[in-house]
Amino acid sequence: MKKAKIFGTLFVLISVIFGAINTHYLKSILPKIDIDSIDVSLRYMMYHGLGLLIISILPIKEKRYVINLFIIGTLLFSLSILILSFQSISNSNFGWLGPLTPIGGLLLISGWIILLYSFIREK
């Protein structure tokens, strides 16, 4: 599916770019707790970006569900953490994004469960 390839590549690209920015620039302006949060966010974005690229070529019936759960889950989980991590240096309050992080995580877990189910059902 084209959507999985586009989002997968985009997620990997964002992970690499922000990983470099985080390592070489942000460590000098953000507290360690925010740097660690950004690392987690980018790691999960990378995992699920690569997952989307792999899933896009697999012949599984439930592919559409897994792809949508991974895309929406990654956007909610990783982007909410990224934005919240910059709260300490901005004048904005992004606290309302906090509840989106676990929702995104649940969507990612659901995608993995559906993928596992499709592999178990495989003949």
Residue map of PLM features:
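Polytopic transmembrane helical bundles with strong interfacial aromatic enrichment
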Residues: M1-K123
